[in-house]
A protein has these predicted regions:
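C-terminal substrate-recognition/cap domain of FAD-linked oxidoreductases
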Residues: 1-115
Length: 115
């Protein structure tokens, strides 16, 4: 699972012709048998909607998968383009899924506080 926060999505909107809402975006990658992947694709949209998700996209062909992941792969460069001359630091965090919303809110607050 990968998360791009709202600030990053703002930078990605319009970068390389891509169009995005300025909202956090989660990326999930699943591997398994056709049946296992189908079960995830049947379950995940409803679970995400229960927590306020407003858009779910999935892909099963390599071309469509690459198109969905393009935003994740372009994130660093989109931020660099939005803020030329500034150093960009990409970080990872590992938290239980149950704490994900809290860490996103806390980090967003840190970004606002630190400018």
């Amino acid at each position: 699972m990968e998360l791009l926060d709202a600030a990053t999505m703002n930078c990605l909107d319009g970068y390389q012709g891509q169009v995005f809402d300025h909202k956090p975006m989660l990326f999930f990658e699943y591997h398994g048998t056709g049946n296992e992947v189908e079960q995830v694709l049947d379950t995940l949209p409803g679970a995400l909607e229960d927590f306020g998700s407003c858009n779910f996209q999935s892909a099963t062909t390599q071309e469509d998968i690459n198109a969905l992941w393009k935003a994740r792969h372009d994130a660093f460069w989109a931020v660099k383009a939005q803020y030329p001359g500034l150093d960009v630091i990409a970080t990872d965090v590992c938290v239980p899924v149950s704490n994900l919303a809290g860490i996103v809110e806390e980090t967003a607050g840190d970004i606002v506080e630190l400018g």
